């Protein structure tokens, strides 16, 4: 009723082909396709860069963990002396 039917779309397509010709429409379609392909490639490259950045570590050092025995065996006096030595 208020929408565009298939026949109206076919008539519009026929008018466009008559106005521009098939060669110009082919080249226009090829240009549009290459633009979309380039856009997808750029988006894919950006995603790879983001994934690569996320997997790299911020710094090159190893995380050290103390076992429970080592943590309990340290004396509070020794801890304060170590803290003073580090400053």
From Swiss-Prot:
Main location: membrane
Any Pfam family matching the protein: TatA_B_E
GO cellular component: TAT protein transport complex
Keywords: Cell inner membrane, Cell membrane, Membrane, Protein transport, Translocation, Transmembrane, Transmembrane helix, Transport
Residues that span the membrane, as ranges: 1-21
Any one GO biological process: protein transport by the Tat complex
Gene3D superfamilies, per the entry: 1.20.5.3310
GO molecular function: protein transmembrane transporter activity
Location of the region described as Disordered in the Swiss-Prot/TrEMBL record: 54-87
Subcellular compartments: Cell inner membrane
Membrane association type: Single-pass membrane protein
Function recorded in the entry: Part of the twin-arginine translocation (Tat) system that transports large folded proteins containing a characteristic twin-arginine motif in their signal peptide across membranes. TatA could form the protein-conducting channel of the Tat system.
Subunit: The Tat system comprises two distinct complexes: a TatABC complex, containing multiple copies of TatA, TatB and TatC subunits, and a separate TatA complex, containing only TatA subunits. Substrates initially bind to the TatABC complex, which probably triggers association of the separate TatA complex to form the active translocon.
Family of the protein in this entry: Belongs to the TatA/E family.
PANTHER family linked: SEC-INDEPENDENT PROTEIN TRANSLOCASE PROTEIN TATA (PTHR42982:SF1)
Name of the protein described by the UniProt record: Sec-independent protein translocase protein TatA
This protein's encoding gene: tatA
């Amino acid at each position: 009723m208020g929408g565009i039917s298939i026949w109206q779309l076919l008539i519009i397509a026929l008018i466009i082909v008559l106005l521009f010709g098939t060669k110009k429409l082919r080249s226009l379609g090829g240009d549009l396709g290459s633009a979309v392909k380039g856009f997808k490639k750029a988006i894919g490259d950006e995603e790879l860069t983001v994934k690569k950045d996320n997997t790299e570590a911020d710094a090159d050092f190893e995380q050290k963990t103390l076992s429970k025995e080592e943590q309990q065996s340290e004396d509070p006096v020794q801890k304060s002396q170590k803290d003073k030595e580090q400053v």
